[in-house]
């Protein structure tokens, strides 16, 4: 029997999954309310939206935008990966595929946000 434990990437993936589901649960209902109801029905002054866009160009705003875009994708890909396993759909190297897509998405979003 080996005394050294096997290394795993699961703690990192579960951290990103947990962050993604938390961000989705806390912020997305507010975004749907604002962008889906209040803004289209004219209940929000358009001047406030211009100020919000200005905030998103600041370093703190860019960080918030990264959090709102990246972490939910990690959560979704983790759910899809394990959901396919639960439905007995086994894809060779599915972890590499799904988490690799999340890494690619992360790089693309970082590039897009920091080029604003």
Swiss-Prot record:
Stretches that traverse the bilayer: 24-44, 52-72, 96-116
Gene3D superfamilies linked to this entry: Fumarate reductase/succinate dehydrogenase, transmembrane subunit
Membrane-related topology note: Multi-pass membrane protein
Pfam families: Fumarate_red_D (PF02313)
Domain of life: Bacteria
Compartmental location: Cell inner membrane
Single biological process term from Gene Ontology: fumarate metabolic process
GO cellular component: fumarate reductase complex; plasma membrane
Keywords of this entry: Cell inner membrane, Cell membrane, Membrane, Transmembrane, Transmembrane helix
Principal location: membrane
Entry-linked InterPro entries: Fumarate_red_D (IPR003418), SQR/QFR_C/D (IPR034804)
GO molecular function: succinate dehydrogenase activity
Stated role: Anchors the catalytic components of the fumarate reductase complex to the cell membrane, binds quinones.
Self-association state and partner proteins as the record states: Part of an enzyme complex containing four subunits: a flavoprotein (FrdA), an iron-sulfur protein (FrdB), and two hydrophobic anchor proteins (FrdC and FrdD).
Family: Belongs to the FrdD family.
Protein name stated in the entry: Fumarate reductase subunit D
Natural source organism: Pasteurella multocida (strain Pm70)
Gene: frdD
């Amino acid at each position: 029997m080996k005394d050294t434990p096997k290394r795993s990437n699961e703690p990192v993936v579960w951290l990103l999954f947990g962050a993604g589901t938390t961000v989705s649960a806390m912020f997305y209902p507010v975004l749907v309310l604002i962008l889906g109801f209040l803004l289209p029905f004219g209940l929000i002054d358009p001047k406030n939206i211009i100020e919000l866009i200005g905030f998103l160009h600041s370093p703190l705003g860019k960080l918030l935008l990264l959090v709102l875009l990246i972490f939910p994708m990690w959560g979704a890909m983790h759910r899809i990966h394990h959901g396919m396993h639960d439905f007995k759909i086994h894809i060779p190297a599915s972890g590499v595929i799904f988490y690799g897509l999340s890494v690619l998405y992360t790089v693309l979003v970082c590039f897009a946000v920091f080029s604003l």
